[in-house]
Amino acid sequence: MLEIFDVSYEELMDMRSDDLYRLRKKTFKDRLQWAVNCSNDMEFDEYDNPNTRYLLGIYGNQLICSVRFIELHRPNMITHTFNAQFDDIILPEGNYIESSRFFVDKSGAKTLLGNRYPISYVLFLAVINYTRHHKHTGIYTIVSRAMLTILKRSGWQFDVIKEAFVSEKERIYLLRLPVDKHNQALLASQVNQVLQGSDSALLAWPISLPVIPELV
């Protein structure tokens, strides 16, 4: 089974921090060539701290995917790292969270889960399930153009708050991701087209979904 669950920063330090930071370096520095700081073949920053929670997707004791969350009222990438691009946006008060460092280890997912396993959509669904379980109102996030395309394909009915440029050629987008039952059902339907899981499994938190041999 593919298991996706949440851990605190302290729990991450005890179990998977090196794995996570190495995969983030592999994803964001090596593959996407983002301007991120790395040390000892790992990527981490000031937002990896005790105020942060992480989703970890594990299969066969191997980390496949992850995303991190910070409460929106705390320092985050919208209010600090990309403040120059989004300082004109008034973020809402209330129980919102910011998400960042969303990634799937493509080579690991292909080897362990298969080419057709909808791992990005499963992680999107897990994000909604987590957010609803913890009674957060919604999510704000900054994404690249490539991630914007993946989100559009998923069917998630998000709002683009603002488009900005970090360089002459590189655009980024501030999004509001709703976590209502309608969007949860849309993502569950996308996943169910391939995995054919039960509603109780698809809408649960933590989430545990089968890996189908014929997809590997």
From Swiss-Prot:
Pfam families: Autoind_synth (PF00765). Disulfide bonds: none annotated. One of its GO terms (biological process) is signal transduction. It is an enzyme of class 2 (transferase). It comes from the Bacteria. One of its GO terms (molecular function) is N-acyl homoserine lactone synthase activity. Keywords: Autoinducer synthesis, Quorum sensing, S-adenosyl-L-methionine, Transferase. It catalyses: a fatty acyl-[ACP] + S-adenosyl-L-methionine = an N-acyl-L-homoserine lactone + S-methyl-5'-thioadenosine + holo-[ACP] + H(+). InterPro entries: Acyl_CoA_acyltransferase, Autoind_synth_CS, Autoind_synthase. The keyword Plastid does not apply. Its EC number is 2.3.1.184. Required for the synthesis of an acyl-HSL autoinducer that binds to YukR and which is involved in the regulation of motility and morphology. Belongs to the autoinducer synthase family. This is Acyl-homoserine-lactone synthase. It comes from Yersinia ruckeri. The lineage of its organism: Bacteria, Pseudomonadati, Pseudomonadota, Gammaproteobacteria, Enterobacterales. The gene is yukI.
